[in-house]
């Protein structure tokens, strides 16, 4: 089991991952306390017969029963894992094994990631387990499932312990050796930063803290401190694994919080061998889930996906089993857009769970009857072998969306997240232009897109801004929507003026505006929250979209944060206008109209073009398109809220593999 820059491989051949999570149908997460190889053999045999090609497992509870107080695992623990791995090997199933869940605080210490004593015990546990199995070729290690940085799970808040406080101050001293300058950045009196600097308070994470005398400018620094500290922990654990002689894959299994405000693959991705996302709740942003988790030059896996039970107020399920399966189909299909596939959570439903949205999750019920999603997984598994032989050398799309962490790691994060999501949908669903995402701290790995879009950034670090301008200097085209006149501490920067434009930022305090695209006028409307917090740009000549040469490239600058206007079509029209100006066209032509809720996303491979199609529409859609690269036509009926995949061979100029039609 290995990875290249984009996909998983087994024995050097690409692997389209269609897997599941498995512990035990009998005792679920207590499978190390009550191991039953007879049941494992039966269940894994069923998973194998379903055609699935990877399983994820590990420890979510009960660590005190696996090892002593120093982290040394008991012999029975290692023998249990050996039996499990041998059973998986019998059925040819690669295994991802997870060590910790949420917070590795089970081995003591005052801080799970920063306390040297705690980290040492974690290393002891991991080292002993990996040493025993370092030569198992089909095994990968997951350091921790869905990590949070502190005991305040699923948030980015300080733990508040002395070790964290000391580490925070050490980090600040290295990053900002001049306390007077730091005080200016945070807009506080210099004397308030004398001595030990406190951790941010809860009020500082509120956008309204300034009304009670507490500004939020330290939040960005605290989040960066947490990101870098966790990335260092992941590097330490990966190095511990490598010391054993293991060359097995190492990862972190993060959920959607990682691409929002928690520990992000944009930071810890360089510490592991592939990145992950767990696509659970963001059902309207399934594509964004994948694009934001994918890091340049590194494979990405939707390592958990499934169906949280959605309930009405009267505790009755909102979705039928068939509708749930259709949603899962869209998630699995979309996982092959710039991703390696998906692992479903979970094969056997866990009736031991107490939360009503967790208990029913899984393909096989406790009475061993199957949900429709089990059939769905079998169908994807049958398709995977014909897909994976084509998963080689994917070309990046010509358009990159650069996301602003300066905004995302502020108390106004919701605006930047919404701008990203709406930019992805406007480009891919409406303008029919495929794109990829690059986070602000990864800007040096941007690549060579023909167009970079900065969607409603409001703020950007000086380093990232310089990199974007350099990209334009060397011949790239940049589209900015709204101002980018603030840095990560919300200090004013005169970036438009520095580019030779007569312009300034001003508060966006109106509901209606117009954007002029050539001879057309696009109406925009901004809601209450946008009027309360956002800025727009004002050009002295009154224009609303400027086009200007810069170096060898060009800049298009719209004065409004278009992605955050109420009507998404306005962003799509702006994107199409700029793309047309620089001769970027959709990679397929529409032979018949497509509903706005249908995604068609092509990826050019070395020998083929991979098309993923997903419907968010309430009506069936007649897909009738022609691929521009091969001239091949695709014509079929896509059922409402379902997905389909087609592989068009470059030599054959026809569909050579398909799913869903």
Write out the residue ranges for each language-model feature.
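Active-site clefts of carbohydrate-active enzymes
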Residues: 105-109, 205-221, 291-327, 348-367, ...
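Aromatic- and carboxylate-lined catalytic core of secreted/periplasmic carbohydrate-active enzymes
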Residues: 333-413, 421-434, 499, 503-528, ...
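N-terminal carbohydrate-binding accessory modules
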Residues: 1-54, 68-71, 378, 389-390
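Polysaccharide-binding and catalytic clefts of secreted carbohydrate-active enzymes
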Residues: 135-266, 271, 289
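A conserved amphipathic helix/loop scaffold
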Residues: 324, 456-661
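Catalytic-core region of carbohydrate-active enzymes that cleave or remodel glycosidic bonds
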Residues: 124-125, 234-249, 266-352, 369, ...
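A short, well-structured beta->alpha microelement
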Residues: 255-264, 425-445
């Amino acid at each position: 089991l290995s990875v290249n820059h984009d996909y998983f491989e087994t024995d050097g051949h690409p692997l389209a991952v269609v897997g599941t999570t498995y512990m035990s149908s009998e005792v679920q997460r207590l499978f190390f306390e009550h191991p039953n190889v007879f049941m494992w053999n039966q269940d894994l045999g069923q998973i194998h017969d379903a055609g699935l090609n990877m399983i994820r497992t590990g420890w979510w509870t009960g660590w005190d029963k696996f090892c002593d107080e120093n982290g040394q695992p008991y012999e029975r623990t290692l023998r249990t894992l050996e039996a499990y791995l041998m059973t998986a090997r019998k059925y040819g199933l690669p295994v991802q094994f997870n060590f910790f869940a949420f917070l590795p605080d089970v081995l003591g210490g005052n801080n799970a990631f920063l306390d040297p004593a705690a980290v040492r015990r974690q290393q002891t546990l991991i080292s002993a387990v990996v040493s025993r199995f370092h030569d198992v070729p089909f095994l990968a290690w997951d350091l921790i499932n869905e990590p949070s940085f502190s005991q305040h799970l699923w948030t980015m808040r300080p733990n508040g312990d002395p070790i964290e406080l000391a580490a925070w101050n050490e980090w600040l001293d290295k990053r900002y050796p001049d306390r007077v300058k730091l005080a200016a950045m945070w807009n506080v009196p210099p004397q308030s930063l004398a001595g030990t600097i406190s951790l941010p308070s809860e009020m500082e994470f509120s956008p309204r803290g300034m009304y009670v005398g507490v500004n939020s400018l330290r939040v960005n620094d605290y989040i960066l401190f947490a990101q870098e500290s966790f990335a260092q922990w992941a590097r330490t654990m990966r190095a511990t694994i490598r010391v054993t002689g293991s060359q097995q894959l190492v990862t972190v299994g993060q959920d959607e919080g990682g691409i929002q405000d928690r520990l992000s693959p944009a930071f810890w991705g360089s510490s592991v061998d592939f990145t992950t996302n767990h696509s659970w709740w963001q059902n309207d942003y399934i594509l964004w889930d994948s694009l934001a988790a994918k890091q340049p030059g590194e494979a990405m896996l939707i390592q958990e996906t499934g169906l949280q039970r959605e309930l009405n107020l009267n505790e009755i399920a909102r979705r039928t089993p068939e509708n749930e399966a259709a949603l899962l189909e869209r998630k699995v299909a979309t996982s092959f857009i710039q991703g390696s596939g998906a692992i479903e959570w979970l094969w056997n439903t866990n009736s031991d769970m107490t939360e009503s949205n967790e208990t029913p999750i899984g393909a096989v019920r406790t009475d061993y009857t199957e949900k429709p999603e089990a059939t769905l997984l079998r169908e994807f598994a049958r398709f995977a072998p014909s897909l994976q032989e084509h998963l080689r050398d994917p070309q990046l799309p010509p358009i990159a969306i650069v996301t602003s962490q300066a905004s995302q790691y502020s108390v106004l994060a919701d605006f930047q997240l919404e701008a990203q999501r709406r930019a992805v949908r406007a480009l891919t669903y409406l303008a029919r232009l495929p794109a990829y995402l690059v986070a602000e701290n990864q800007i040096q790995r941007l690549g060579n897109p023909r167009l970079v879009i900065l969607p409603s950034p409001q703020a950007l670090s000086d380093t990232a801004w310089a990199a974007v301008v350099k990209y334009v200097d060397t011949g790239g085209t940049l589209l900015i929507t709204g101002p980018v006149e603030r840095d990560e501490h919300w200090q004013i920067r005169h970036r438009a003026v520095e580019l030779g434009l007569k312009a300034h930022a001003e508060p966006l305090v109106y509901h209606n505006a117009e954007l002029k695209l050539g001879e057309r006028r696009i109406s925009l409307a901004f809601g209450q929250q946008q009027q309360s917090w956002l800025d727009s740009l004002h050009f002295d000549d009154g224009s609303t979209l400027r086009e200007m040469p810069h170096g060898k490239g060009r800049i298009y600058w719209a004065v409004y944060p278009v992605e955050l206007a109420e009507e998404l079509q306005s962003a799509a029209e702006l994107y199409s206008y700029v793309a047309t100006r620089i001769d970027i066209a959709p990679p397929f032509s529409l032979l018949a109209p497509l509903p706005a809720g249908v995604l068609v996303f092509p990826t050019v491979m070395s020998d083929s073009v991979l098309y993923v199609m997903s419907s968010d529409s309430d009506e069936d859609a007649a897909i009738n398109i022609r691929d521009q690269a091969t001239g091949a036509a695709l014509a079929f009926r896509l059922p409402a809220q379902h997905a389909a995949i087609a592989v068009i061979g470059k030599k054959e100029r026809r569909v050579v593999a398909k799913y869903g039609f």
